[in-house]
Amino acid sequence: FSQPFSRPSSRVVNGEDAVPYSWSWQVSLQYEKDGAFHHTCGGSLIAPDWVVTAGHCISTSRTYQVVLGEYDRSVLEGSEQVIPINAGDLFVHPLWNSNCVACGNDIALVKLSRSAQLGDKVQLANLPPAGDILPNEAPCYISGWGRLYTGGPLPDKLQQALLPVVDYEHCSQWDWWGITVKKTMVCAGGDTRSGCNGDSGGPLNCPAADGSWQVHGVTSFVSAFGCNTIKKPTVFTRVSAFIDWIDETIASN
């Protein structure tokens, strides 16, 4: 990231332990280095064999696996499903440019080498209808295993934090994110209420009218001045702006 204003967002700060398996579509995306796999990003299971994550999480030179049904990373709980990713099954949005995170399109799809086994601890995320826009202050939750504070450790247990949505009208004001934020993004947080942000690539979970949860955002970036910077909410790729691309990519692969 060459931009002075942003960096990959990788923490839930001032969050809380999630209820185990409550965000049952949350995955850990891990890359291989020196014979071991390391957590790098979050993601959401949107089909039995497809995960959505952030474009900046993917490097085509790396080998990845996905862990589903995870809660406490330090314990083998028996619910985990570890699924390898084949090299040709990483689909980063064609307009993603790693030198311009503010340009948007920070989204990628990962095809699993086999289908997940769905159950109470591994479920599919619901996606919003195309074009759906959240109202200001919508009570969304971020989730992830990101760092607990800047430069700090990764937590063992999945964290969550309430991040109210900041609508485009507010988030694009000059003293907030200004022109950095685009209409294809969602802002949430930006004050001290909930602290910070979750793993890059992970979900912004928002309640739908029927009481279910929908993944409205893919965690993209935060302020370089730190996590819970006033008027610098966490910025997410707006999933409802990319429904067509998601559908087309899955259908053709």
Curated annotation (Swiss-Prot):
Q: How does it assemble?
A: Monomer. The zymogen is secreted as a ternary complex composed of procarboxypeptidase A, chymotrypsinogen C and proproteinase E.
Q: In which tissues is it expressed?
A: Pancreas.
Instruction: Report the domain of life of the source organism.
Output: Eukaryota
Entry coiled-coil feature ranges: none
Location of the Peptidase S1 domain: 12-251
Predominant subcellular localization, coarse grouping? secreted
> Any chance you could tell me the propeptide residue ranges?
1-11
Supply one GO BP term: proteolysis
Q: List the disulfide bonds.
A: 41-57, 100-103, 140-206, 171-187, 196-227
Q: Where in the cell is it found?
A: Secreted, Extracellular space
Q: What is this protein called?
A: Proproteinase E
